[in-house]
Structure formats: structure tokens, C-alpha cells
Amino acid sequence: MKLNALWIAAIASLAMAGCNKAESPAEVQHDTAAAQADAQRDMADATADAREDNADAAKDVNDAVADNDADDAADQAQDASETAAKGEYKVAVAAAEANHKVAVEKCEALSGNAQDDCKNRADSDLDNAKRQAERRRDGTG
């Protein structure tokens, strides 16, 4: 029975040794470049979506103004303002997530506790950026 416990402990320690292991500089550079490329695509998509939504909202406002409907124009203007805030939020979150992806890949160059700390900082930065984006969207920041 003691032999089984020793084998289990040995296997567990070998498995744990592979965790938080630093990647080679070339591997980190490759992964970071890939994360940056993904981040640029994500940012471009979020920005394009926000622009499209804002253009649609502006068209609705212009249509209401052209119809000489003051109440509808006011409603559409409010909707356009909310659409702009949502778009800014989406872009800010995309930027935060993009920065997070790149930061986490850079953390892979570290090992052990330094890697854990680096990833925890990246996670914390992401959470803070998302909260800040929410406050701006909601008009409280």
C-alpha cells in the first residue's frame, strides 16, 4: 500500500513540474505575435460593428428629423446616444481583451510564481478595464 502511495506522489510531482514552466523565447515571441494579430482583428471587428451601429442610429435620427417629428427625433437621438455608448463599450472591452491575450502570452516567458503573478496581474487589469468601460457606458465613470 505504501508503494502505491509513493507512486502516486511521484506521478503527481512530475505532473506538477510541467505546470507554470517557461516557454522558450522563440515560442513566446511567436505566440505573442499571434495574439497581437488576433487582437488587431478583434479590435477592427468591434470598431467596424460600432461604426455600422452608429451609422444606422444616425440615419434613424435624420429620418425622424426629415419627417418633422420632434418626439420621434428626440427618441431616436436618445437611442443614438445609447448606441454610441454601447459601441464605445464594445470597443473598450475588445481592447482590454486584446491587451489581456498579449499580456498572458508574454507571461509564458516566466516560470513558477512569477508566471502566476504575471497572469494574475493581466487578469486584474482585464477586470479593471471592463469595469471602467461599464462605468463609462453607464455614465458613472
Residue locations for each model-derived region?
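Bacterial Sec-type N-terminal signal peptides, specifically the leucine/valine-rich hydrophobic h-region
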Residues: S13-M16
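Bacterial signal peptide processing site
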Residues: G18-E23
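Juxtamembrane extracytosolic/periplasmic "stalk" immediately C-terminal to the first targeting helix
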Residues: E27-A35
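Bacterial N-terminal signal peptides that target proteins for export
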Residues: M1-W7
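Surface-exposed, polar/charged faces of alpha-helical domains
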Residues: D42, A46-D49, D53-R131, R135-G141
